[in-house]
Amino acid sequence: MIEITNYRQGAILNHNHGEETEKSLKVRIEGISDHGCPVMVNGMSAEMDGRRFSADIDLTEKINTVTASTITPYGNYSQELTLVWDKKSFKRYNFYIDDHIFTFTDLAKERPARAFDHFYLKGLKEIHEKYGTVFSLNCFYHNDHHEFLLKDMPDIWKSEFTDNSDWLKLSFHAYSEFPDRPYAEASAEEIGKDWDLVQNEIYRFAGEAAYIPPCVTHWVNIHPSAAQEMIRRGTRCYAGPLRLRVMGGPSLADRQKGGNMTEIQARSISGADRTAETLGLNLHYGFDEENNYCNNHRSYYDPLLKLYFYYNGVCCNLLPVKEIPGRVESILSVADKYNAETFGIVSHEQYTFPYYPNYLPDHMERMDLAARLYTEAGCKPVFFNDGVLGNTIWDK
């Protein structure tokens, strides 16, 4: 057996991992050859140290194949990995906000002269003007709290949305807030129908320039058929695994009627809302290797799906203001150790609205703070669905 040990399948590598020039990224490949026989890495002889081997190779493409092979008296063995060169990488962050329908409901009812006079859009624009933050607003078609359909959103502010589309994008999220996990058992046709409803309305009232494919669906969990349809429609990255899993957060009852947000946030911060109580349950429900890797490295690439998977780490509606600096500092510290440069912020629209049962008066302040902290850490705002998680150098 032979195994490359210092990089995972789909590892995203940047200038911090080796020596970068205009033409290549030179990185060291390390591993173990059980029989201690000579190893070749991409056709070059590796240095041997007992069973251990190492070799310096050049990554010259965005997507690179690395093959380690050995010939032994017992047969021939090889391993192939896909590594991504994040060329001219830079620290960056993506910010998406889920569950948008209240803003459109208000706009249709109030009809202000300018859409960005509405307190919510005005607040986001102020964050953008201070830090350059760009937002993806993931949208519902139906409002489950106050009867409204996205088809009833006026198009009188279309030029305004188009004019701001360089920093504010709208995307599909789900038909409506309820039920939970709407695409866990959905077919391609079912998610496609809902997707078309939302996307067509975005085109109508905001313009095609304001649209971006989603990097997450409602409750994240998604059926394989729905996932394939999502990828076919242009999704290039996803915030966490596609498969069904325990999510945590407010219960259905808490979200419908209101709950104790202090208690909900405390359970989220501690992890008690999603952690298995015993080792046996954790081994059954958990994917520790993937979780540990993403918590450290923040992202990886799946070459079969041609999809980038990444972790956020900061969900503003679940982190009180006093907890956000510590969370961001922890994420940045670990990322520096593992040479990671991609970060994510997420939140949910409804917590900004006084008439929502779980209203958080400081929700906009939380989002402002998260954006400011990543900006002060030298991170640039990007849309992860573009290029290599927001780095578009390979597209130029």
Residue ranges of predicted features:
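Short, compositionally biased P/S/T/A/G/V-rich stretches that sit at domain boundaries
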Residues: M1-E22
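Aromatic/hydrophobic beta-strand junction motif of beta-rich domains
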Residues: V27-S33
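Surface-exposed, short loops/turns at beta-strand junctions within beta-sandwich domains
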Residues: D56-I63, P73
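Active-site beta->alpha N-cap acidic-glycine motif
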Residues: E80-F161, Y211
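Metal-dependent polysaccharide deacetylase catalytic core of the NodB/CE4 family, i.e.
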Residues: V134-H223, R245-P250, E341-G344, E349-F353
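Active-site-adjacent pocket scaffolds in enzyme catalytic domains
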Residues: E147-L149, A209, N221-T342
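C-terminal domain-boundary segment and adjacent tail
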Residues: Y238-L242, T342-K396
